[in-house]
């Protein structure tokens, strides 16, 4: 510490490794934003995502869909996981693609800046894989679920009906009229949804392009640690 007269600074450390783990600090935020399983709460949330929402003239409508399970006249897709967006519980492919890409790109540019203190689920304990790659993989797994294949691609989970109250994700009680299922919106180039809850997405190429570039970078960087997934 530094002492000047009667004034003392807090204790601080002088070391060649003082900045170790600084790059990993951002991952604390990413882990607490996780959907499906939250390592901070040690509990799961939104495990029933979700039922598909799309217009009748969208590519891959009822007559061509092959990936969903139909229960009680609902077209269901397994879309759990990923990250909650901002301070609500909506999820977007385009922002998740960007987040995952930047995690991967940061590791590619400076892999020695990242450490390994957490496992793939975000729980404490090293697993032999840099935490930044674990976090990126969490996002990549969700993005993979959002693109079952062909012309069938999804870009959003939930909508502004989410904005009712502050609550923990494990205590989310917002009802979209389908029990525990939340709506999953298709990429169509047109806004999807109901009345004032209709989303504003008109992108197709931008979402697909970000998806392709993120997946390509993920495949490149995960070849060593997870070749089967890559």
Predicted regions and their residues:
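Well-ordered alpha-helical scaffold segments within catalytic/enzyme domains
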Residues: 4, 89, 100-122, 139-149, ...
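Extended acidic/polar, glycine-enriched regions
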Residues: 1-28
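Aromatic- and Gly/Pro-rich amphipathic surface segment
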Residues: 45-79
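Active-site lining segments of carbohydrate-active enzymes
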Residues: 82, 86, 154-230
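Asp/Glu-centered strand-loop micro-motifs enriched in Gly/Pro and often flanked by an aromatic residue
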Residues: 1-2, 69-92
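Acidic, glycine-anchored loop motifs typical of Ca2+
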Residues: 121-132
